[in-house]
Amino acid sequence: MLWDPNEVVDSRVVSSSEWWIDLKDYKELEAKAGVYLFANAKYDIKYIGTAGARRMVEEVKCAIDRKKSKGATKVRALYTNSTEKAQSLEKYLIAKYNPVNNQT
């Protein structure tokens, strides 16, 4: 399913990465709690993951190492105020987008 830009309006999201960045540049993400999304060039969501406080870059790297980025070329982060809000947002987004790499 293609990314809906209105998702950043969710009350759990306090900020987000400026836009989608190349997956290879994931270290540019801020080290905050939140949800990260992998997508292809057409913004079809391939994977959604969560990161606790100060763990965004580490969690994205771990997901890449676990091959969760298969078919993806872009990454975006939606930052939250807490791990709990990140987990709640992740659950909602996975249910909505049903990403292929979350099923493996």
Predicted regions and their residues:
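Basic, amphipathic alpha-helical patches used to engage nucleic acids or provide basic targeting signals
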Residues: R55-K67
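Coupling/hinge elements of helicase-like and P-loop NTPase modules
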Residues: P99-T104
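Acidic, divalent-metal-binding catalytic cores of TOPRIM
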Residues: A95
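GIY-YIG nuclease catalytic motif and its immediate N-terminal context
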Residues: M1-M56, E84-Y92
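A short, exposed loop/beta-hairpin motif centered on an aromatic-Gly-Thr core
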Residues: I45-I48, T73-N81
